[in-house]
Amino acid sequence: MAKQDYYETLGVQKGADEKEIKRAYKRLAMKYHPDRTNGDKAAEEKFKEVNEAYEILMDKEKRAAYDQYGHAAFEQGGFGGGAGGFGGGFGGFGGFEDIFSEMFGGGASRQRVVRGEDLRYDIEITLEEAVRGTTKDIKINTLAACDHCDGSGAEKGSKVETCPTCHGHGRVRRQQGFFMTETTCPTCQGSGKKIEKPCKHCHGDGRVHKKKNLSVKIPAGVDTGNQLRLSGEGAAGENGAPAGDLYVVIHVKDHHIFERDGSNLYCEVPISFTMAALGGEIEVPTLDGRVKLKIPAETQTGKLFRMRGKGVTSTRAGYAGDLICKIIVETPVKLNEEQKELLRKFEESLEGQSKQRPKSSSFLDGVKKFFDNLGK
């Protein structure tokens, strides 16, 4: 089958300059590269054709010969072994390596720099500490720069030379036929350097496992799940790269009196049924101490009283939430006979006075209506 015209293969005019040819090649090479086409044989053949056309048209002498004689210029070894041989590798054609560097990240042009790992530390604090803020001393296990070699990985006085395999890049490229692969340098493991005598403390890594003590300032208003970021307090990076960060995750312990919902606090306040009926004044706890709360007469169980500004100061909004007290009317227990008799007389005195028992009368009315509807 006759070969397609090289200019048509790249989709350019015969008078196209090098920039147009390179731009067309880059677009087509990315489209048909085997790494992107999952083994498609047709795409692989197209990729070879695109490479062959690019090789010829980017070489001034080969392009001139092609323009004059067409494909015949390269048949039977007519032009230094013919097109498509790629005997000199990608670098020999002044453009392949640059283009593949752009397409796949350019990793061989610089030494690998790996930032240190981020670390997590979970800490428990009390509700009081969460509301007021506190400072906690913690101890973490981390990778720190080796003090013996100052993070270089080399014994003092030992030579540190550029890796002869990757020339300091940390990565190597290999050409396999039409394809180029890039891997971590097997000689230096990506460091880009060759150490004559590795540090005996860190074994050439430049980092050692170490316990580190830190003081963590926890602001007022934090809640469970909040994270504090300590920049640069994570693991040390490789080859002198920046350290990672430490994330301190807050867990607020359950409180024996209060429950928290955002900036508001909730608590249950027990009162006697006498206090509920007659009213009065009680003391309720807050995180700032006890405060007085007036209980109006005829207070029912479940009644909520809001004490403004007695909750938690929000870290975002900057204002304090409320303390919400839920009244629980307690039923007296372990009564003696005299007390029981008094209650019986009190109960008898309420007979026929439904208005004095609003919940009961409302409930009984509802029950009566329910059964009346069933009978219809």
Swiss-Prot record:
Compartments, record wording: Cytoplasm
Intervals holding CXXCXGXG motif repeats: 146-153, 163-170, 185-192, 199-206
Record text on cofactor binding: Binds 2 Zn(2+) ions per monomer.
Zn finger limits (CR-type): 133-211
Biological processes per GO annotation: chaperone cofactor-dependent protein refolding; DNA replication; protein refolding; response to heat
Gene Ontology MF terms: ATP binding; heat shock protein binding; unfolded protein binding; zinc ion binding
rRNA-binding is among the record's keywords: no
Cofactor(s) needed by this chain: Zn(2+)
Domain of life: Bacteria
GO cellular component: a single term: cytoplasm
Coiled coil (residue ranges): none
Residues given in the record as Zn(2+) 1 binding sites: 146, 149, 199, 202
Family: Belongs to the DnaJ family.
Domain notes: The J domain is necessary and sufficient to stimulate DnaK ATPase activity. Zinc center 1 plays an important role in the autonomous, DnaK-independent chaperone activity of DnaJ. Zinc center 2 is essential for interaction with DnaK and for DnaJ activity.
Name the record gives this protein: Chaperone protein DnaJ
Organism name: Mannheimia succiniciproducens (strain KCTC 0769BP / MBEL55E)
Primary gene name: dnaJ
